[in-house]
Amino acid sequence: LNSTNDNLGNFMQYVVQYAEGFLKKTEIKVSVRREVDSPETKLSSEMRRNLFLCAKESLNNIYKHSKANEVYITFNLNADEVFTMQIVDNGVGFHNNQNSGYGLQNMQKRMNDVGGKYEICNSEKGVCLYFVVKI
């Protein structure tokens, strides 16, 4: 994570490259949607690092636990400079007693550290993770 690349465009590209590389040898297909009109928008190093580590943990969980064959990554920046990264899989979801793993706790802490929010939606049709932060 080179600090000279601290903008949304480079961050999104880095996350997508990581996801595709990490899941390359699996049956999991990566689909990406970018809803960002200003990819040059600056992103602090701390925010970039924490968001990336949340994405990495999410993808690791999908690989290890989901039994998914697709993952959808959506990036959105609204007019109020609120950035959302959504990672969704079409796997089996998880039992509520599995909702307290260290990885999930770490994602919550990382988002708190940058003044953001983390939300997880779970169903038998997969898991949806939302990471939201004001830039």
What are these regions (language model features)?
Residues 1-10:
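Flexible helix-coil linker/loop segments in the cytosolic histidine kinase module
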Residues 10-47:
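Helix-loop-beta hinge of the Bergerat
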Residues 48-71:
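Conserved ATP-binding N-box helix of the HATPase_c
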Residues 70-81:
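Short beta-strand/loop element within the Bergerat-fold HATPase_c
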Residues 75-77, 120, 131:
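Conserved catalytic core of two-component histidine kinases
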Residues 82, 93, 123-130:
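Glycine-rich nucleotide-binding loop
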Residues 89:
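Acidic ATP/Mg2+-coordinating residue in the GHKL
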Residues 96-125:
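ATP phosphate-binding glycine-rich loop and adjacent ATP-lid/helix-beta elements
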